[in-house]
Amino acid sequence: MTDSTIPGLLARIQRPTDVAGLSADDLRTLAADLRTAIIDTVSKNGGHLAPSLGVVELTLAMLSTFDPGKDKVVWDVGHQAYAWKLLTGRAADFHTLRRRHGISGFPKPCESEYDHFGVGHSSTSISAALGMALARDLAGDDHHVVAVIGDGSLTAGLAFEGLNQAGDMGRRLIVILNDNEMSISRNVGALSLFLSRNLSKGWARRVKRDVETALKSIPGIGDEMVAYAKRSEHSLKSFFTPGMLFEAFQFNYIGPVDGHDVKALVRNLELAKTNDRPVLLHVLTRKGKGYTPAEANPAFFHGVGRFEPETGRARKPGDTPVLPTYTDVFGETLCRLADMDERIVAITAAMPEGTGTNCFRERHPDRFVDVGICEQHAVTFAAGLAIQGYRPFVAIYSTFLQRSYDQIVHDVCIQKLPVVLCLDRAGLVGEDGPTHHGAFDLSFLRHIPHMSIIAPRDEADLQAAMYTALHLDAPLAIRYPRGVGFGIPLAESPSPLPVGVGEVLKEGEGVAVIAVGSRVHPSLEAAERLAEETGRHATVFDARWVKPLPEAQLLDIVARHDALLFVEENALAGGFSSAVLELLADRNALSGKHIRRIGLPDEFVEQGTQKELRVSLGLCMDGVGKALKELFAAVGNATAS
């Protein structure tokens, strides 16, 4: 949005510190303006709507309490930080949210001095904030460090590792638990208010220490009396609040607090600032707050595409028939397989809707497991199932599988267990940018012994790959992209694919395109268009298998062509083309060949639509066509000379 379209009071916020001087009425008005701006932009650009709507008041309270030019705030994941962006100098550019060359959907230090740590994946905030707190103390500074983490992110082991270390180190640190799964009980809230406002105050802590010292001085029974007193206090607090868990981590606990009451939030944040040890402020919020469709369906509006703000309905792309997504095909195929094979268990890490396993949850609830945001646990859990004769399908976004690397090596591949890793969102995902692109899975999986990798070229190939998985008694990774397929009809009874065998889709001479995964069809289209325009025919080969490679077919193609064009939507470093070139180098088959590769460069690809990013990197029909013309020219020049 431009300055002229920034709603109401929000347009008057020139710097973050302006929030601290606002009246209660102004804060309510500003909260409404923030929600208007967020809904308007996300309805046009897509994004994480419900999480950001739920923390508007919390954001206002934080900016009323802390100085973001001095104090440090780490947002966990960061998809709830839209209000923070609007209030920290980016309101005029907010209309570019998640667009190419626009502002990111996540906090990025290179974007703003008020984004103190880069995020995108879950559960990193406490560890990062603790490191920043230690850095503060080592430097002799006195600012506050705050981590804001959701209850979902708190399920991950990394978050508990951070809590454990923070409690042990005892550094001054504030953790805000944004809990949008609980409702506020008036009775619990009243008692909690008393406990947090009194037992957590400085004078109460001093009295507590003095009493402990006095009790310990009593000969014979002092230590026992101190232990009894602590048990009594903890029992009282934990009976009415969840504070016992965090007290066990040696955090002072405050809460729960109504996350939509700015006055209460400010009061308790000020209280948290007085603590000389780690403190956790438990805040209860409502996901999607202030927008009825999002409040009614927060899961759908967690991450949403373009929609009509008046109704919340998705914007329709005209009269074009909507094709099924790869995720849809995966979910339905997995259900069909499970209908036939009782060994199949579906596992996801807090993403049943995102991975398409929600239909499996409904049809086979006893064989569906959502492990929460615990990708490491998901893989080892699957290994335990596999070693007992089951066939676990682990559905995880490619970018999140990075957390499971050791478990894939140690628990799955060394034991050669038939765990099927289903890598959704492999390749370029679009507007969520570098933290979410599935850029590296081929590179970090293909060198692991016993691992097989298949990259289906379309939705029908994905279906067949899943049937193939049931016939392999070894680990298998199936990678497929975000978005809709190519409209290829699905088979009623798919046949398993032969392992390590690709397919020649077009015969030509001189130049061969060797592609894999979602870039096969654009490569074929480019070759066919080139043939129509110039009469030059390039061979198009779908390798399909990244491991084991279709070695015999590749060597035959290389022997018959002078130039090779590799196309893949993975990092070129260590990816599919690297694997083929290693094979050719080992077989001394590269001499005199013209080589060209199209893939992801050795840099983090920024945000944009999938189409924009593919065009910019040449991973589209036009890009492949341009490379083919250049290779044909190179071959012709070499022949002429």
From Swiss-Prot:
Keywords on record: Isoprene biosynthesis, Magnesium, Metal-binding, Thiamine biosynthesis, Thiamine pyrophosphate, Transferase
InterPro entries according to UniProt: Dxylulose-5-P_synthase, THDP-binding, Transketo_C/PFOR_II, Transketolase-like_Pyr-bd, Transketolase_BS, Transketolase_C, Transketolase_CS
One Gene Ontology term of the molecular function aspect: thiamine pyrophosphate binding
Known EC number: 2.2.1.7
Cofactor binding comment, as recorded: Binds 1 Mg(2+) ion per subunit.
Keyword set includes Magnesium: yes
Residue numbers binding Mg(2+): D151, N180
EC class of the enzyme, as a word: transferase
SMART domains: Transket_pyr
Pfam families for the chain: DXP_synthase_N, Transket_pyr, Transketolase_C
Positions bound to thiamine diphosphate: H79, G120, H121, S122, G152, S153, N180, Y291, E375
Cellular component aspect of the GO annotation: cytosol
Known role: Catalyzes the acyloin condensation reaction between C atoms 2 and 3 of pyruvate and glyceraldehyde 3-phosphate to yield 1-deoxy-D-xylulose-5-phosphate (DXP).
UniProt-listed PANTHER family: 1-D-DEOXYXYLULOSE 5-PHOSPHATE SYNTHASE-RELATED, 1-DEOXY-D-XYLULOSE-5-PHOSPHATE SYNTHASE, CHLOROPLASTIC
Subunit details: Homodimer.
Similarity section: Belongs to the transketolase family. DXPS subfamily.
Name of protein: 1-deoxy-D-xylulose-5-phosphate synthase
Organism for this UniProt entry: Nitratidesulfovibrio vulgaris (strain ATCC 29579 / DSM 644 / CCUG 34227 / NCIMB 8303 / VKM B-1760 / Hildenborough)
